[in-house]
């Protein structure tokens, strides 16, 4: 619910501000007067990303330690279904030989899903606690709605793409792939390099921006509903959108995982 002291524009802007740390002075940034500098980090995005990553590790480790060959509990059954689903996806889409891909795909799917799931929390709950209890100037709780987080994850995937490309094809083979495709003639090397370079770089960019765009839009719609409508009518739109958003949350985690598997499978193909 929007604060009585805020206009709808102020309310929306307030919820789109990150809690930032200026690395030059190690002080919190005033969200209403941010410095024009590269040396800031969104510590709320980093905090929730790390906490949710640790939550994933704790939950899955606890299930693995308590796993039984008898009749599993509901939580163990759910975890086994997720693992089986991810493992099946990897077997269907990854045609190379690597023990890293399945754990990586599982980590990506669950971690991104948990980050996306934060979007279903009441929009004012944690920011209110942060402001009135902890005295923080701003707080955003959806890490995947921060382009820095999604592009950082995509950068990690890009590094793996380069690693597997060089590992499977060698530096010479990878160089030939960039310079002699699609036109297999030395005269077209500059053209091939541009085309293949753009194609290669577009993978992490599109991977990161796709997740960011969908989650940012979802977060913004929740903020608009809370900021522009009276409290008694917000449920009329909030509940249907939240139900639909559950599909978006799961789908975006799945798409990020699938594209990662596909890109790494392409990088692992020997020519």
From Swiss-Prot:
<dbReference type="InterPro" id="IPR000568">
    <property type="entry name" value="ATP_synth_F0_asu"/>
</dbReference>
<dbReference type="Pfam" id="PF00119">
    <property type="entry name" value="ATP-synt_A"/>
</dbReference>
<dbReference type="InterPro" id="IPR045082">
    <property type="entry name" value="ATP_syn_F0_a_bact/chloroplast"/>
</dbReference>
<comment type="function">
    <text>Key component of the proton channel; it plays a direct role in the translocation of protons across the membrane.</text>
</comment>
<protein>
    <recommendedName>
        <fullName>ATP synthase subunit a</fullName>
    </recommendedName>
</protein>
<comment type="similarity">
    <text>Belongs to the ATPase A chain family.</text>
</comment>
<dbReference type="GO" id="GO:0045259">
    <property type="term" value="C:proton-transporting ATP synthase complex"/>
</dbReference>
<feature type="transmembrane region" description="Helical">
    <location>
        <begin position="242"/>
        <end position="262"/>
    </location>
</feature>
<feature type="transmembrane region" description="Helical">
    <location>
        <begin position="220"/>
        <end position="240"/>
    </location>
</feature>
<keyword id="KW-1133">Transmembrane helix</keyword>
<keyword id="KW-0812">Transmembrane</keyword>
<keyword id="KW-0066">ATP synthesis</keyword>
<keyword id="KW-0375">Hydrogen ion transport</keyword>
<feature type="transmembrane region" description="Helical">
    <location>
        <begin position="100"/>
        <end position="120"/>
    </location>
</feature>
<dbReference type="GO" id="GO:0005886">
    <property type="term" value="C:plasma membrane"/>
</dbReference>
<keyword id="KW-0472">Membrane</keyword>
<dbReference type="GO" id="GO:0042777">
    <property type="term" value="P:proton motive force-driven plasma membrane ATP synthesis"/>
</dbReference>
<feature type="transmembrane region" description="Helical">
    <location>
        <begin position="146"/>
        <end position="166"/>
    </location>
</feature>
<feature type="transmembrane region" description="Helical">
    <location>
        <begin position="40"/>
        <end position="60"/>
    </location>
</feature>
<dbReference type="InterPro" id="IPR035908">
    <property type="entry name" value="F0_ATP_A_sf"/>
</dbReference>
<keyword id="KW-0406">Ion transport</keyword>
<keyword id="KW-0997">Cell inner membrane</keyword>
<keyword id="KW-0138">CF(0)</keyword>
<keyword id="KW-0813">Transport</keyword>
<dbReference type="InterPro" id="IPR023011">
    <property type="entry name" value="ATP_synth_F0_asu_AS"/>
</dbReference>
<comment type="subunit">
    <text>F-type ATPases have 2 components, CF(1) - the catalytic core - and CF(0) - the membrane proton channel. CF(1) has five subunits: alpha(3), beta(3), gamma(1), delta(1), epsilon(1). CF(0) has three main subunits: a(1), b(2) and c(9-12). The alpha and beta chains form an alternating ring which encloses part of the gamma chain. CF(1) is attached to CF(0) by a central stalk formed by the gamma and epsilon chains, while a peripheral stalk is formed by the delta and b chains.</text>
</comment>
<keyword id="KW-1003">Cell membrane</keyword>
<dbReference type="GO" id="GO:0046933">
    <property type="term" value="F:proton-transporting ATP synthase activity, rotational mechanism"/>
</dbReference>
């Amino acid at each position: 619910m929007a604060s009585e002291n805020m206009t709808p524009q102020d309310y929306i802007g307030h919820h789109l501000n990150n809690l930032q740390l200026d690395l030059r002075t190690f002080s919190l940034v005033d969200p209403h007067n941010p410095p024009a500098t590269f040396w800031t980090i969104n510590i709320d995005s980093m905090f929730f990303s790390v906490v949710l990553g640790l939550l994933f590790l704790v939950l899955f480790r606890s299930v693995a330690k308590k796993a039984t060959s008898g009749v599993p509990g509901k939580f163990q059954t759910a975890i086994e279904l997720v693992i089986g689903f991810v493992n099946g996806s990897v077997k269907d889409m990854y045609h190379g030989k690597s023990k890293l891909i399945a754990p990586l795909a599982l980590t990506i799917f669950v971690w991104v899903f948990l980050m996306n799931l934060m979007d279903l929390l009441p929009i004012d709950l944690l920011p209110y606690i942060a402001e009135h209890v902890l005295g923080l100037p701003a707080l955003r709780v959806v890490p995947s709605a921060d382009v820095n987080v999604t592009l950082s994850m995509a950068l990690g995937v890009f590094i793996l793409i380069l690693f597997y490309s060089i590992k499977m094809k060698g530096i010479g083979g990878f160089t030939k792939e960039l310079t002699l495709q699609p036109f297999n003639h030395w005269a077209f090397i500059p053209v091939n390099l541009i085309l293949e370079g753009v194609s290669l770089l577009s993978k992490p960019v599109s991977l990161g921006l796709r997740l960011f765009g969908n989650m940012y839009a979802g977060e913004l719609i929740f903020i608009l509903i809370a900021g522009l409508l009276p409290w008694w009518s917000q449920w009329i739109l909030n509940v249907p959108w939240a139900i639909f958003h559950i599909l978006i949350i799961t789908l975006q985690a799945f798409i990020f995982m699938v594209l990662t598997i596909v890109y790494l499978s392409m990088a692992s193909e020997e020519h």
